[in-house]
Amino acid sequence: LFLCPFLPVISFAVIFINSQVGILLFLMSCLFNIILSATLKRTYEDDLKSIFYASNVLKQGYTISKIKHAPQPEVNFKQFRTARHLTSVLAEVNDEDIGAMVIKLVKLIFMLDYVLFHSIQKSYTTHMNELKNCFDYIAELDNHYALAMYRRTLECYTEPQIDDSNDGIVFSELTHPLIADAVANDFSLSQNILLTGSNASGKSTFMKSIAINIILASAIQTVTASKFVYQPGIVFTSMANADDVLSGDSYFMAELKSIKRIVEIPDNQKIYCFIDEIFKGTNTTERIAASESVLSFLHEKSNFRVIAATHDIELAELLKQRYENYHFNEVIENNNIHFDYKIKPGKANTRNAIELLKITSFPAKIYERAKDNVPKI
């Protein structure tokens, strides 16, 4: 294989010694190399995309490194000169262009694709550590650029402060990063919390805001708040559970598995747990009994910080010695419901499900009967 690319040149030289033999050898060597080139290409064709990708990374790294004040990678780009300048030769040419077809024929005759591919591959293998450094260089710059662009889209953000002496989280003006015109909340999560409140009052969004910002704080040192002091930890959630027809799990079974996963977490590192509408998939009596038991169990784990949301006001009373009660509420006026989405101390003292029947134009008979049923239950 080493001599094959030179056969057409050698046979062409023979023409000047013996024209008939030389021409015959030249044609045979050209035909042989064309067939051999096409056959060999199948063995490395799948790797061409990786070669092109690595070459583009090297080109971008080299270009960026030449920018004034740009950080310099630990890469000697001279060692990859062949890869940066000649990888494009390996690209497919346009079969409808006569000039391109001539180039393709020359490449086949002299096996240029095969020679270049293995030359570039050898340089990558020889200088693998520097190639990895270039990938890391581009990845780091891309990460910083993406983070800077993300921060520019935020109306309010800050870098989190780590305080290992703080057993929870303290934040000001925290918002959900994916909600436009989100309502900000101030809070200190120093104890386990039980959230109560009406439907759509903001319980779930508040928990998601905290959970997402803990992850953002750990991942990109950016939170959507004006202040965020926390002890780093791992986030576990049991939210938005759903039944699974394929596996045969009912909603309640899916919820059980989700909460069991949290219960079995070892108590050897900081854990932040968020449980939304705990055990809502079963009847009221057993839901309250099971919820009290699970939340009491989690309370005993010293490294856990738990925020659980429920519609069961009774649960707030049962857990008042272990969990601090907070709530969200609403105001109903003139058949309109208004939420301020602000967290408040204490358990909820309002309910809106029946009033929502009226506001959403259910038949008056249904609304009145539901209202009359409340004292009887």
List each language-model region with its residue ranges.
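ATPase nucleotide-binding head domains, primarily ABC-like/P-loop NTPase cores
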Residues: F16-L24, L36, L147-I377
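Alpha-helical coupling/stalk and coiled-coil linker elements that connect catalytic or binding modules
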Residues: L1-S198, F206-M207, A211, A217-I234
